[in-house]
């Protein structure tokens, strides 16, 4: 019987690792309080309540797509000094853009750096010995950054860490939202899309505009691009793994949350294994019903091919 195991964060939590995003919240708050404040200020625009901010961390990757860019612009306008101001200096050509970059870079670069150091600490925690029976000859698709499969279960082959492995310093850990950013158009793109006459009219209309504003929009656009999880690209880069699943007869899903962000991977698994039996873990009764709904109505798995079990 050829098997595929799909491993989610609940697998590490089951083994006692403090790997929830709530734990990451505490880590960020201690190690970079300024970043913590920026996350809760700009990534949860709909509410200021403590309960709502906890929800932000519960669905942290999705929350990266909640950037309140209007609030970000309002903040940066404090650094947008009018041309001809009595105190004008050349540095004012860049203060608006710099204030935007400081925040967007912290929500991208600093956040990812801190994620890696946190996972490195998590990965040092010795997992408890409540082992789950696993088939060493199976294939493994892991959504975790940690080495629990390798260290506790002594598995070493046929494991794809689809979002990266913390020990691989040469690759970036994949983290992001699912909102595909709109393509940004360069001045050359705009020029090529118009007739010469229309382009001259366009330039005349923009003649009085502040170029710092346009540069600021590029900075915000870069945030959306850099924080986007391009699942199609990730699948394409790992197509060899998915193409090798055609003979899989059983799929064992352990500790996966079935986040909408990651459903593209599961669609690809289903495409390769249309007749496989699914054995799926859940933690709460609410999850049990939600997972069944996703499997049947979104992924198209036949109901008689699904078994759910409590973990």
Task: Spell out what each predicted region is.
Residues 1-15, 237-311:
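SIR2/sirtuin-family catalytic core signature
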Residues 12-14, 20, 168, 180, ...:
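Short, electropositive, low-hydrophobicity segments enriched in small/polar residues
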Residues 184-243:
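Acidic, metal/cofactor-coordinating or nucleic-acid-engaging core segments within structured domains
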